[in-house]
Amino acid sequence: MSSMRTHYCGLVTEQLSGQEVALTGWVQRRRDHGGVIFIDLRDREGLVQVVCDPDRPEMFKAAEEIRNEYCIRITGKVRPRPAGTENTNLTSGKIEVLCYELTVLNPSVTPPFQLDDDNLSETTRLTHRVLDLRRPQMQYNLRLRYKVAMEVRKYLDAQGFIDIETPMLGKSTPEGARDYLVPSRVNPGHFFALPQSPQIFKQMLMVSGFDRYYQITKCFRDEDLRADRQPEFTQIDCETSFLTEQEIRDLFEDMMRTVFKNAIDVDLDAKFPVMEFREAMARFGSDKPDLRVKLEFTELTDVMKDVDFKVFSGPANSDNGRVVGLRVPGGGAISRGEIDAYTQFVGIYGAKGLAWVKVNEVAKGRDGLQSPIVKNLHDAAITEILKRTGAQDGDIIFFGADKAKVVNDAIGALRLKIGHSEFGKASGLFEDVWKPLWVVDFPMFEYDEEDARWVAMHHPFTSPKDEHMQYLETDPGKCIAKAYDMVLNGWEMGGGSVRIYRSDIQSKVFRALKINDEEARAKFGYLLDALQYGAPPHGGLAFGLDRIVTMMAGADSIRDVIAFPKTQRAQDLLTQAPSAVDEKQLRELHIRLRATEPKTTV
């Protein structure tokens, strides 16, 4: 391999017995057993046991002085371990290396934690990320990330895609998430924006005749962070010309099947199911449903319109209200304390409470139900609730009644919480498999009540369905987009659409978004001009590499599959970024800081 080492530690096996090897790595652990020193030597491939006998005094003295995380080099002979001392958990577990020479390449100060400590706080891990990355799970995660990226590249290369870089310094288009702005020193008062996606550039590449483009690139969004979000993230960005929506979906579905098979030996469905956005929201309250959870909403809005219970009848008679039931088979066993905990949980999503009915005996109707709300429901409503939900003896039905968004968010989250709970798994309400699907036919626009205007649900370059073009100027709320998301186990793995490729249609969409022609020309004139030069029909899709690897690795957060991530406050604890800069740098950029106004309290 090199003059310093002949093999990786974790790859030394019984096939090398009797051979002399040179190994380098870090001391995982050192044990002194009555005059014989054992060293667990670690590198990226794993561990090997090194034995140091005192009959080599100089080597043995060096072994006595080493400590955890010292970087060392050893030479020695591979030999079988004594019978009964084998370690079946290690690739090298049947052998050990009898050390001849030991050189300390670099000592280490005492680490702030043991690498095998599984109870570290994320703050500690991110502050000492260099050490955290030495841990076997983190080594595995980042190597898996590399493998996934390589499989993507191999697949797309075989399909004729060309890897083309697009600019990192671009024009700010304040639609959607906030841009990260970069001041221009040579153009005072002007700013670049870091890309939220290469969207417009890849469309212009289609106009330029590069009919199959991709890149694996960084994107940036200045938004509030969650477990699956980072201010900078990596996108597998793809665009094609002259393919239909179905052909685009088929192509990238096959890519994802291939990547999962080659990267982690998982066979995804031979054909992903397809679900309309409207159906996903009706059944699961989410446009990225986790199909592993075998619980669904039951629509009860119409049933509750005339009940003498304002908690239900109010939303049922409201234009933007919704009432649903969530039947949990066997849920009658859920305790009152657990119900109270669920009530508190849905409050996180804006729900004002959580009504419930335990079904003790269906045949008895009202008399077979246990709940404080039963007295507020008339017999016809009770009969219809039991019928629609398919309630059985021993079930519980939870209810959500509020604005549709609150109901979808709160009861949707409750569905997942129950399904993923120990009760849910023991009751067969959760299936531990890979469940991909396509969600299609998204609304083109959604109404922003605060700004009193329509906004693009995905982005303003998505094409409406051909038969819905007529609604752009008359009734934007009716427009359905040629948009599609690939969802896996409740995570959006990627999303895309067929794009608008005619300048006149793009202008109509801008007008529907209350972007007048003058503003559209100022912000997107270069795109509108490009579309006039015989732009081809085109569409594409972008996958979140971080999310894909997180799913494959079974990690809790995308921060576990990124080498140097930011916290949920968008800070890098290792380098202490972001940081203050000196006055000279600010003057060169023609920037003056304004003092933060103190918050006033009433």
Curated annotation (Swiss-Prot):
Region annotation Aspartate: residue ranges?
A: 199-202
The record's function comment reads: Aspartyl-tRNA synthetase with relaxed tRNA specificity since it is able to aspartylate not only its cognate tRNA(Asp) but also tRNA(Asn). Reaction proceeds in two steps: L-aspartate is first activated by ATP to form Asp-AMP and then transferred to the acceptor end of tRNA(Asp/Asn).
- Keywords attached to this entry: Aminoacyl-tRNA synthetase, ATP-binding, Cytoplasm, Ligase, Nucleotide-binding, Protein biosynthesis
PROSITE patterns, per the entry: AA_TRNA_LIGASE_II
List residue numbers at the site (Important for tRNA non-discrimination). Answer: 33, 84
Per the record, the GO terms for biological process are: aspartyl-tRNA aminoacylation
Q: What EC number(s) has UniProt assigned to this enzyme?
A: 6.1.1.23
> Which annotated residues bind ATP?
221-223, 230, 492, 544-547
Q: Which protein are we looking at?
A: Aspartate--tRNA(Asp/Asn) ligase
Its GO CC terms? cytoplasm
State the family it belongs to.
Belongs to the class-II aminoacyl-tRNA synthetase family. Type 1 subfamily.
Q: How does it assemble?
A: Homodimer.
**Which compartments does it reside in?**
Cytoplasm
Task: State the top-level EC class.
Answer: ligase
The molecular function GO annotations come to: aspartate-tRNA ligase activity; aspartate-tRNA(Asn) ligase activity; ATP binding; nucleic acid binding
Instruction: Provide the catalytic activity annotation.
Output: tRNA(Asx) + L-aspartate + ATP = L-aspartyl-tRNA(Asx) + AMP + diphosphate
**InterPro entries in UniProt:** Aa-tRNA-synt_II, aa-tRNA-synth_II, aa-tRNA-synth_II/BPL/LPL, Asp-tRNA-ligase_1, Asp-tRNA-ligase_1_N, Asp/Asn-tRNA-synth_IIb, AspRS_core, GAD-like_sf
Q: Which residues bind L-aspartate?
A: 175, 221, 458, 499
Which SUPFAM superfamilies does this chain map to?
A: Class II aaRS and biotin synthetases, GAD domain-like, Nucleic acid-binding proteins
